[in-house]
Amino acid sequence: TKANSMTTGRIYKSVIDKERRGDYLGKTIQVVPHITDEIKRNIKLLGQKYHYDFVITEIGGTIGDIESAPFLEAIRQMKWELGKRAINLHLTYVPYLKAAGELKTKPTQHSVKELQSVGIQPDVLVLRTEKHLDDDIRKKVAAFCNVDFDCVVQSEDLPSIYDVPINMLNQGLDEAILRKCGEQIGDKPALGPWREFLDRQRKATKEVHIGLVGKYDLQDAYKSIREGLLQAGVYNDHK
């Protein structure tokens, strides 16, 4: 729905419209508090409207981008206001240098330091990587980034994006999040239908080639169509 997506343009338009109506009583419009308050209002709106237990909000871009500064400030304020009811999960990249045959954690360390410099301490780190990370690397990242060891999980390259939730479950990401939120940890979910889908995907034997004519070169522009076709194919023994 409309409440599930938030753009910078929509945030600024909403603030400008409020200023034109006189909602701010003639005050000078500032990034803090007016823009940040509007960002927080939009984030909270989804949970208040539909009474969700959890609301997941993604802040796109890269730490340090000037465009994301108001959003990061809003997130910092929300953590301060909500305490344990909000956690910050940071997705970061651990590159593999093929020539040297080693994984480098410096980009992750610097990324976290950038976050800390604006007042945000990640509660959980998800390390995006091409190669498997051993415990020594995870311990190093945990120590340098002030994050609990069991809250440093890896997201390595997998055959299918649908394998990722199983990988996260096996590493205990769900339990780490529940602990950080002070929630009770129940039985481990079986994810039967999800595993059945993955099994069907691996065992699909027939191939079908579908041409999609579109306006844009970027594949993600048609992500929902591509994934819809993929899922329909899996349930009909096609890949």
Region locations from a protein language model:
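Flexible phosphate-sensing "switch/lid" loops adjacent to ATP/NTP-binding sites
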Residues: 1-238
